Amino acid sequence: MALDKNQIAKRIARELKDGYYVNLGIGIPTLVANYIPEGISVTLHSENGLLGMGPFPTTETVDADLINAGKQTITYLPGSSFFDSATSFAMIRGGHVDITILGAFEVTEKGDIASWKVPGKLIKGMGGAMDLVASAKNIIVAMQHTNKEGQSKLLKECTLPLTGVACVKKIVSDLAVIEIVEGGFKLLERAPGVSVEQIRAATEGNLIVEGEIPEIIV
């Protein structure tokens, strides 16, 4: 059983540690805000100028003037700070973000990431991802393992323009949890009911498998 988007986000949330400052990219990463583990305190950063982002609002608490970088309505927690983009990016470029969680079109076995441009589609530009991949201490990617045509998105070399080089540390896809190590993609966990052989078939890059691979707890 492949993981859905919320299950991917929930698994990524278990990577967070108490005291972390965390930036959530657009797409699946924004869902991580709903699954912060009990007993830890993390501060979520939105690059449009908010430190202290909370979970998504209910219909009763929604505020149309309060949005994240992806233009989704959000909440904020007590003690939050609002500031301009220059200050926000000074935090990023200064190396103050412990973990960045990004979506991606492609990731290579060396940790390269392509996350901003698809040929033939009009796009405004790379956005804040270029700063995040260069400055964050740790980068985790949330993504589907294959594209709509069933082709692998975990590659030997990216086919799309790069966002960053050798920067991704870990991937949580709908099929697996994978760590980028010397020599390729190291399989750490697999989605419930998904075999190692299925993951290998869906991975173009070199998949490293050591011993028994546990299932992801969902």
Label the model's feature ranges.
Residues 3-7, 58-218:
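Conserved phosphate- and dinucleotide-binding cores of soluble alpha/beta proteins
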Residues 1-77:
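N-terminal active-site beta-alpha-beta segment that forms phosphate/nucleotide-binding
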